[in-house]
Design a protein with these regions (language model features):
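Structural signature of tandem alpha-helical TPR/SEL1-like repeats
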Residues: 2, 14-23, 48-61, 71, ...
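Conserved nucleotide-cofactor-binding alpha/beta core module
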Residues: 392-524, 529-539, 609-753
Length: 770
């Protein structure tokens, strides 16, 4: 009788008539309390209904009656696993497998429990055993692929995921996971293919859209990434991860203000999400709102005091721009103390965690405080080399010098900015004009987007590599090329290059003045500078050995001016305005020098100062405008009558603005470099005064090389007087213009610095082996 009732209950169970099934299971148990199958099936029903705790008790009763039933132990394991009691689940699966070792599905379940318990190695063994016993287990193959990817065993991951797609070709998940493997390999084109395949199979797969967006971000195709994230949100607005990714994509476009609501939305669905909290801090940091950024870094650190990106930014973040000199001092002291704190933290930190911190920040803005940064740069450099050497010990020891006699020297150049960028314009002449009879030139471009400048530079060298996927990929190529000398055109502007510079990849390593400050790195041997730019005590400002190339130190090509330049009216400038072009990034303007502009305006009628808006944010532009308003107010002048801000311009429009201007005002303590050279090409009179450090003496050096010293002020008073005279004395202004035009040949296309560089490099190598 009980057997018939049990069969009837099971039929109800299978057909989804669960209430009827439950009644009959209870009836069977009442009639025969030793009916283990009834206890087991009743437990399975409770499990299906989501009452896992009841299921556990019922199945345990079944096992007490029939302890050798393997399926009972598996069912108990499933109930424990669904209830979150992972170790008990593992124990139950192991009991099952002790009774039935070839039970492939249970090995899969054991893998699921290990995986949920963060035991990656245990899960891998379980899944591998499962697929050996039964090769068509999709779950085991798919999850193996996920775990192999996490272990960076990418070929294994690809193999098992391909098997999974063959077993279940219409299941989108394995295709999506294949895309993630290729993302991990930084093969973004292939990743995009597989994510798209997943979406074809399941157009509502929000995770696949999110992952596709991440792959597009890997290729720097941010607009396509944003489209994917919007689609993800449309399908599933409660998917938390997309808000972090969307915000990061907007930040990559410089749209920090737009990113903030998406980060905050991510926090609404996951309030303790430390990565999103830190990302919010970064967004406020890049908006120039330092104090707001600090609040979010503090919030992140209350969740995890050792979260490296938040910790490093909390202690070492610097504002983009300052409201006054007191702020400069306050933030500098904060950075100095923070550097000591981080140095102590690194002593006990996990190597990879420390690397995350190092990768999250640079000292870029430190140099815009107008101080001697040698000691602070050296402290940060010591941190960098320590962290990099622990993470990459194989790339941190000194390279032995090979015999260079009777062969060409192998010289490498690396930068993220071998594209239409100041760095490329300043240093392409070295790459082009190093004598190919004596040098094989290797170029390593680590930026994501190439352009006509990239193509041009590639044509100048014997070996060109465009590698933006990872530090490891760049380093491995450099090591394969077995260079004699590696030259960094800039350090301090790109996280990738900054970390590479902290490694020892060639016997001799040099730094150029693309970012004109000492690296502070023991891995950099020489700083390649300019004899005209350095002050007499210049060597004291560097941890590297200072090398003075003649003139301005570079071979700079004559800029090509637009055939049909825009006129003043197109920049909202009047014909009778006296236009002073001051076109630097706003972080170059120190607040103690704001008075210079109203001091000139007070004496030059219809003076108009033209600035370029911040690339970072409107907030930074508004902060600078507020400073200028205060400075002009102190002179009883209205800032808006004299100051014009233009948006970022195309290269040709920027040159048109130079051609439409009357006078170029150099920034104080951080001089124009490429901008000054382009102003010279447009025959603009350059007003400058030499700063304390090389970075404040670029324009001074350029004018000295052209033997035009009458617009160089010995001090700020002279600077203002020269600017005023140029504004009021049109005849003198034209004389200076004519002189500049006549002397272009003294500054442009000068090959002597590159010839000197070649001789220096050969001398260094020959002395090393003699």
């Amino acid at each position: 009788m009980t057997r018939q009732l049990l069969e009837k209950a099971l039929n109800y169970h299978r057909s989804g008539q669960w209430q009827e099934a439950e009644k009959l299971y209870r009836q069977v148990i009442n009639q025969d309390p030793n009916q283990s199958d009834a206890w087991h099936l009743f437990g399975l029903l409770a499990h299906q209904l989501g009452d896992h705790k009841t299921a556990i008790e019922l199945i345990k009763q079944a096992i007490s009656l029939s302890p050798n039933q393997a399926d009972f132990h598996n069912s108990l394991g499933e109930a424990y696993r669904q209830d979150g009691q992972l170790q008990s689940a593992i124990d139950s699966y192991c009991c099952c497998l002790a009774l039935k070792p070839d039970y492939a599905e249970v090995w899969t379940n054991l893998g699921l429990a290990y995986q949920a318990n963060n035991d990656r190695s245990g899960a891998i063994v379980a899944y591998e055993t499962a697929v050996k016993l039964k090769s068509n287990l999709w779950v085991a193959l798919n999850n193996l692929g996920v775990l192999y990817r996490q272990n960076e065993e990418y070929e294994k991951a690809i193999n098992v995921l391909n098997q999974a797609t063959k077993i279940s070709p219409k299941n989108s998940i394995a295709y999506d996971n294949l895309g993630l493997v290729y993302q991990s390999k930084e093969e973004y084109d292939r990743a995009i293919f597989y994510h798209k395949e997943a979406i074809k199979l399941n157009p509502k797969d929000h995770q696949a859209y999110n992952n596709l967006g991440n792959a597009y971000q890997g290729l720097n195709e941010v607009d396509k990434a944003i489209e994917c994230y919007l689609q993800t949100i449309k399908i599933n607005p409660n998917f938390c991860e997309v808000y972090l990714n969307f915000g990061n994509a907007l930040c990559n476009r410089g749209r920090f203000r737009e990113a903030i609501p998406y980060f905050k939305k991510g926090l609404e669905c996951r309030p303790q999400w430390i990565e999103t909290i830190t990302a919010l801090g970064n967004a406020y940091r890049d908006l120039g709102l330092g104090n707001e950024a600090i609040k979010y870094y503090q919030q992140a650190l209350t969740i995890n005091p050792n979260h490296a990106p938040a910790l490093w930014n909390y202690h070492l973040m610097l504002p983009v721009i300052y409201r006054n000199l007191d702020e400069v001092i306050e933030w500098r002291n904060r950075f100095t103390n923070g550097l000591l704190t981080i140095s102590k933290w690194v002593e006990s930190a996990d190597a990879k965690v420390a690397l995350q911190g190092l990768s999250s920040i640079s000292t870029f803005y430190l140099q815009y405080q107008g101080q001697n940064d040698r000691d602070l740069q050296q402290q940060f450099g010591q941190l960098s080399t320590k962290i990099m050497s622990v993470n990459y010990p194989q790339w941190s020891y000194n390279k032995s010098q090979q015999n260079v006699r009777n062969r060409k020297l192998k010289v490498g150049f690396t930068s993220t900015f071998f594209k239409e960028h100041t760095i490329a314009k300043l240093f392409q002449g070295w790459i082009e004009y190093l004598d190919p009879n004596y040098f094989d030139v290797y170029v390593y471009f680590t930026g994501k987007k190439s352009d006509r400048f990239t193509t041009q530079i590639a044509s100048y060298c014997q070996h060109f590599y465009h590698i933006f996927t990872s530090i490891e990929a760049v380093v491995q190529q450099i090591l394969r090329d077995n260079l004699d000398i590696l030259i960094f055109t800039d350090v301090g502007m790109s996280p990738t290059v900054d970390r590479i510079a902290a490694l020892r990849l060639s016997p001799v390593q040099c730094l150029a003045w693309g970012h004109p400050i000492t690296s502070g790195l023991s891995t950099i041997d020489f700083f390649l500078s300019s004899e005209l730019m350095e002050p007499p005590e210049g060597a004291d400002h560097y941890t590297e050995k200072l090398v003075l190339l003649p003139g301005i130190g570079i071979t700079y090509k004559t800029p090509i001016l637009p055939d049909a330049p825009k006129q003043r009216s197109e920049f909202n400038l009047a014909i009778d305005d006296v236009v002073y072009l001051s076109c630097q990034s706003l972080y170059k303007y120190l607040p103690q020098f704001d008075f210079v502009f109203p001091a000139i305006a007070q004496k030059v009628k219809r003076s108009k100062f033209v600035f370029i808006e911040s690339l970072h944010s409107e907030e930074i532009t508004e902060m600078f405008k507020a400073r200028l308003a205060d400075a002009f107010h102190a002179y009883y002048l209205n800032c808006e009558d004299h100051c014009l801000f233009v948006q970022r311009l195309t290269p040709n429009d920027y040159l048109s603005l130079n051609l439409a201007s009357d006078i170029y005002l150099d920034t104080i303590e951080w001089s124009g470099g490429n901008t000054t050279l382009e102003a010279i090409a447009c025959n603009l009179p350059i007003v400058t005064t030499p700063g304390q450090f090389m970075r404040g003496r670029h324009s001074f050096a350029m004018l000295k090389q052209m033997e035009i010293t009458e617009t160089i002020g010995d001090n700020l008073t002279n600077y203002i007087d020269i600017a005023v005279r140029l504004g009021n004395d049109q005849q003198w202004r034209q004389e200076v213009r004519d002189k500049i035009k006549q002397r272009h040949h003294l500054i442009f296309n000068d090959k002597k610095p590159t010839e000197f560089l070649g001789n220096f490099l050969m001398g260094v190598m020959n002395s090393s082996v003699s």
